[in-house]
Amino acid sequence: MITKRIIPCLDVKDGRVVKGVNFQGLSDVSSPVELGQYYSDSGADELVFYDITASSEGRRLFTDILTEVARTIFIPLTVGGGISTLDDFDRVLKCGADKVSVNSGAIRNPRLIFEAAKRYGDQCVVLSADVKRVDGVFRVFAKGGRENTGMEAIAWIKKGVELGAGEVVVNSIDTDGVKRGFDLEMLDAVCSAVSVPVIASGGAGGIGDFVTLFKTIPRVDAGLAASIFHFGEVTIPALKAALKENKIPVREV
């Protein structure tokens, strides 16, 4: 049986891990290197590193901190933020990333997904979609959730997978940092539309939200969270123990 993955997320701004609510009001949390090592040692299955202002500021992702994080951890690392070209893929992979997450860059140039999958393999290409309800319709947002693209989210995610994305991270702006549970309706729609692994992001407020996620939508492959892990509200060993008790398969800590 395929185990469910638990993935902490480091949202990095100016070299520090930050966290906000609904993609707004960012507050300083910790050093990405220290936090990355803590999660690697605590039983996290993977780590996600987002340079959250690279796209909106029109610059390339910070590679010095990324290299240090990659050297410190012993779990797979997915990296995103400001990824617009194959050169960007090369740069972060050389820093030690295992997978590269594309978002705004792929919206501007969808062929980037195809070219990257062809060069590195689809297992290396992660499509990250920031999604919000607008008048009852799931819409894709770009530039760290600041810009409504007008694109319908499910159609865009399907297109990204058809172009070669081997995994999808669905970030719910509506539930981000609110801690009232994952957006199950949106995740169910995405899982029904694609056959690649889907990672749920945004809204985890406690262990019960992960149990509900995996029980309600078994096709979801992984749960990603930030606040509850960063502030010690939930530890990964405790979360995995609870999932195991609920007969949800996880990798042993």
Pin down the residues of each PLM region.
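Glycine-rich, proline-tolerant flexible connector loops at the mouths of alpha/beta enzymes
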Residues: 46-64, 104, 169-181
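Structural preference for beta-strand elements that scaffold enzyme active sites
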Residues: 5-9, 46, 74-78, 99-101, ...
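Conserved anion-binding
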Residues: 12-14, 18, 97-170, 174-175
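Alpha-helix-loop-beta-strand connector modules within alpha/beta enzyme cores
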Residues: 57-78, 115-130, 180-205, 247-248
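Catalytic cores of alpha/beta
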Residues: 77-78, 83-96, 185-222
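Conserved, mostly hydrophobic/aromatic
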Residues: 11, 39, 47, 79, ...
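Glycine/small-residue-rich loop that forms an oxyanion/phosphate-binding "nest" at active or ligand-binding sites
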Residues: 53, 61-120
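C-terminal helical cap(s) of enzyme catalytic domains, especially alpha/beta-barrels
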Residues: 113-120, 214-252
